[in-house]
């Protein structure tokens, strides 16, 4: 093996923050020579148990998981409304996460260690012809399913300049209409450019076998242009 990747999520509080860095430094010291230590971190807006500066000192690579911002539930009061703004990676939130990770006082000091993780989650809603919510269930179509829907001639794709995320409107075989937020070539390249603005040139992809590379939905080829 080449090394270890640590992905502990949901960490909160000063005690955990201190103990986690101690654990990582001890782990790094225990690894055989030449083995790498990668550490995944979450945005500290909600998860306060990540000491970015300390983690950066212990790790060979720090991977920022600034994704999956979509809703986890929908209030019943939203049914019948057009409130479906649930982008998976709203640009302002990703910006805030990158800013905090690279903060001169508390962030990772060596920016060459940093990578922005790109994930390919989705958030879909069952809507009527006026885009009103018919139910409060959130659907999560896989990239392979989205590729098929995006290839349909009647599918509409709208790119939100506010969120820098696309949403697709499509109809299934039974006549049901869905609105789905997801990642596409443009949204991924926008985040790559944003990361570069902070001096971050590394990208991490979640996960192998889940990266869209279809004719109508080809993020992989777009990423290769940034090498």
Predicted regions and their residues:
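Receiver (REC) domain switch/active-site residues of two-component response regulators
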Residues: 2, 60, 201
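C-terminal functional modules
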Residues: 206-208, 212
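Short acidic, glycine-rich surface-loop motifs adjacent to enzyme active sites
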Residues: 3-10
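Glycan-binding loop/region signatures in secreted carbohydrate-active enzymes
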Residues: 113, 120-193, 220, 224-227
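Substrate-binding surface in catalytic domains of secreted glycosidases
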Residues: 13-146
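Short acidic, glycine/proline-enriched helix-loop-strand junctions
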Residues: 15-16, 20-22, 33-35, 212-227
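Conserved, well-ordered alpha-helix/loop/beta-strand core segments that scaffold catalytic motifs
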Residues: 187-205
